[in-house]
């Protein structure tokens, strides 16, 4: 079975611990069989917010699915990514729900 690519979406701006949060989710998703595209790997400075969103959008577009971290609604960028995924009819899921099912053995 071919692994699915998944884009990780959540709050980055204003969260000093975003890298740890994203890396932990990436680790768990990879253990679950996904190939994870993690926008937290982008440089933390040097670009305008809109430039980051264009880069993240390109990453999202290339993935089969999108996974939303619990704080995604607190992020203007992640809300925009949700809208983009919805408009593309791209499958998406919520990390908390996925993790709960995984922990329950489903």
Regions inferred by a protein language model and the residue ranges of each:
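Conserved catalytic or regulatory cores that recognize and/or transform ribose-phosphate-containing ligands
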Residues: 1-106
